[in-house]
């Protein structure tokens, strides 16, 4: 189950939409229509991600993975909490406000994605590509940590 029918969801559906039974929930009818037209096998529901009744009707109780990808960090955190309460094993939330990340981690959200951090990691990978095996970047309010793994040679 995915909440939010934006570009991140469309990119995800490009990769996974045909392999899994997917339900996308979004209150914006135009975005929902676009996803439904582009991915006919995906069930699209025009509703809020915070509507617990809709989540139940769409089968959150039997859902293995819940992806909260709306443009609202707060909505994503709350909907992941609801998913956990309904027995969902894996949750992922898109959180754009960096100050929310530690709190979201303490709420047992399995994975957190943040465009700023992802982009920073990609830039580091590109800049250091020739001499670096992998790189990751974590940035919080008052600190930034960069992990770079350099191959032996």
Placement of each model-derived feature along the sequence:
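Cytosolic regulatory regions of ion transport systems
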Residues: 1-153
């Amino acid at each position: 189950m995915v909440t939010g029918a934006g570009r991140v969801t469309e990119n995800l559906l490009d990769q996974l939409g045909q392999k899994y039974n997917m339900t996308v929930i979004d209150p914006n009818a135009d975005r929902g229509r676009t996803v439904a037209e582009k991915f006919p096998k995906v069930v699209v529901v025009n509703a809020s991600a915070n509507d617990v009744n809709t989540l139940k009707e769409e089968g959150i109780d039997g859902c293995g993975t819940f992806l909260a990808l709306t443009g609202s960090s707060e909505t994503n955190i709350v909907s992941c909490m609801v998913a956990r309460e309904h027995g969902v094993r894996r949750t992922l939330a898109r959180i754009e406000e960096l100050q929310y990340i530690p709190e979201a981690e303490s709420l047992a959200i399995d994975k957190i994605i943040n465009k700023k951090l992802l982009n920073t990691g990609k830039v580091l990978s590109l800049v250091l590509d020739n001499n670096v095996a992998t790189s990751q970047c974590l940035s919080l309010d008052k600190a930034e940590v960069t992990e770079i793994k350099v191959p032996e040679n």
